[in-house]
Regions:
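Membrane-interface loop-to-helix entry segments
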Residues: 143-193, 207, 247-251, 384-390, ...
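Hydrophobic transmembrane alpha-helices that form the core helical bundles
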Residues: 49-56, 65, 74-153, 158-161, ...
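Helix-loop-helix junctions that connect adjacent transmembrane segments
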Residues: 19-24, 62-63, 139-145, 172-301, ...
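Membrane-water interface regions at transmembrane-helix termini and the short interhelical loops
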Residues: 24, 83-84, 108, 130, ...
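Select transmembrane alpha-helical segments in multipass membrane proteins
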Residues: 27-37, 102-115, 148-151, 206-219, ...
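Membrane-interface "cap" regions at the ends of multi-pass membrane proteins
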Residues: 1-61, 73-78, 199, 203, ...
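TM-loop-TM module centered on a large, flexible mid-protein loop between adjacent transmembrane helices
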Residues: 95-97, 102, 133-138, 246-315, ...
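A generic transmembrane alpha-helix motif of multi-pass inner-membrane proteins
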Residues: 380, 384-385, 406-465
Length: 465
């Protein structure tokens, strides 16, 4: 049963908690709300998969690349948190733009956000496949990649379908254990090198600014999903207070973790026979150099499970965006139904799980490796996230200006966020990257065009809403 909205964004400075849309009310604690954003970021996966990719581009500037990415994400996070203090809804960034931008742009935000979460889930399924074979090695017969992909997607969808509270607790424990273990290895690596500053990582005379820019754009993928706590809406306790804190807190905590890890990994691989850029298990190598080889195996196991947690977090976020889209005519009406007992978006969870599985499964069948799936799907996801981030920052400026509350500080914030994200988006397009990355912008545009064609009738209804 829906609960009446106490206020809307158009009411001025008042705040609002949206209807529950059949979801459980006030079921998640502040820590569990934070867990949604943290698990979608999946901080333990970046030191093992993303940092080596950033190092391949930025070299010794890897830590600076992460500092650049953190600055951009904080700008967007401040815009999102400002909205989250005024309204809580399972529609996330889509709900924020719906009340402030023209219907077409709000619909664009919705479809971009759903695409971003689904592609991120598909990406980490690829990461799961890659790391499963690294971790399992020669233990027993090799399980077919297609079967592994189906298994991780099916279990994540089932948990999301079953209970969001169980999901949040599970994700919190998984990420906490993984992050603590990685922090221990990085800490021992720093101690082993005498805790002195590695000046080479901050000497701009020997760091290519062009490659630093490219590395910084790739480092953004480590942060995407930090805003996913906003998809919980009224499922969180005191959502107007806990959700903004989760958004900013997850970005800052993850950023600090990434800065330390990227610095420690670059330092730890100096003089190593294998480059960080080509290492398949960097934490296992660093653990061995620190004299605690057993920790490397435990970390690999934790990262593997963290990949599952990230898949789960993305399915949860995508299903709730899809739920509100269905309520507003942007998706099939049956997707707005919630399970009568679990009080979760049952059918939307299944659709989100399938949207995550099918791209990864299609690539696996064609013989594409897990690492490539992680990189390719992650790049596609960035297009969706950057689109949603740009429109959310613009929506905040429009929302406050319409109500005469746009101060100079907020104006500078929103303009800075929009410009920063537009630059990041352009960096993924020009200079024209090599194949297959050069085709990804066209795939994304084709997806948006297809969504618009499918929802022509729904767009008219949405405009009336």
């Amino acid at each position: 049963m829906m609960h009446e909205m106490t206020a809307t964004l158009s009411d001025g400075p008042k705040t609002a908690v949206s209807p529950s849309f059949g979801l459980r009310l006030a079921t998640l604690s502040p820590l569990e709300t934070l867990a949604q954003s943290v698990s979608t970021i999946a901080p333990s996966t970046s030191p093992t998969l993303t940092v080596p990719l950033v190092f391949a581009l930025a070299g010794d500037g890897t830590c600076l690349a992460y500092a650049l990415a953190l600055g951009l994400i904080v700008l967007v996070g401040l815009c999102v948190a400002r909205f989250a203090r005024e309204s809580a809804s399972p529609g996330s960034l889509y709900e924020y733009t719906r009340g402030s931008l023209p219907p077409v742009l709000a619909a664009l935000t919705a479809w971009a956000l759903f695409f971003a979460y689904a592609m991120t889930a598909s990406s980490v399924i690829g990461g799961f496949l890659n790391y499963a074979y690294v971790f399992l090695g020669g233990l027993g017969p090799r399980v077919p990649a297609a079967l592994l992909a189906c298994a991780v997607a099916a279990v994540a969808t089932w948990v999301a379908y079953r209970d969001v509270k169980i999901s949040a607790r599970l994700m919190l424990w998984i990420e906490t254990i993984s992050v603590v273990l990685i922090a221990c290895v990085v800490g021992l690596t720093l101690v082993r090198h005498g805790l002195h500053l590695d000046r080479a990582q901050f000497d701009l005379r020997h760091i290519s600014l062009g490659r630093l820019r490219l590395g910084g754009m790739l480092a953004i993928f480590s942060f995407v999903g930090f805003e996913s706590a906003t998809t919980l809406g009224a499922e969180a306790r005191e959502p107007l207070r806990t959700i903004p804190r989760a958004v900013i807190g997850s970005a800052l905590l993850a950023g600090a973790f990434f800065l330390v890890c990227s610095y420690g990994e670059v330092l730890g691989f100096r003089g190593a026979p294998t480059s960080l850029a080509t290492s398949t298990a960097p934490m296992r190598y660093l653990a061995a150099r620190a004299g605690i080889s057993f920790a490397g195996v435990i970390i690999d196991a934790g990262v593997l499970v963290s990949m599952f947690a990230a898949t789960l977090g993305c399915v949860i976020a995508a299903s709730r965006v899809l739920l509100l889209m269905a309520h507003n005519g942007l998706a099939h009406g049956r997707l707005q139904q919630t399970h009568h007992h679990n009080q979760t978006p049952g059918l939307a969870s299944i659709v989100a799980g399938l949207a995550a599985l099918l791209p990864a499964l299609g690539l696996v069948v064609r013989g594409v490796g897990g690492a490539d799936i992680y990189g390719w799907m992650g790049t596609l996801a960035v297009f969706g996230f950057l689109t949603a981030y740009v429109l959310t920052a613009a929506a905040l400026a429009a929302h406050l200006r319409r109500r005469g509350r746009l101060g100079s500080g907020t104006a500078v914030l929103t303009v800075s966020a929009v410009v920063a994200m537009m630059v990041a988006l352009a960096a993924n397009i020009y200079p024209v990257p090599e194949a297959p990355y050069r085709y990804f912008p066209y795939i994304y545009l084709a997806y948006l065009a297809g969504a618009a064609l499918l929802c022509r009738r729904g767009l008219a209804k949405f405009a009336r809403v």
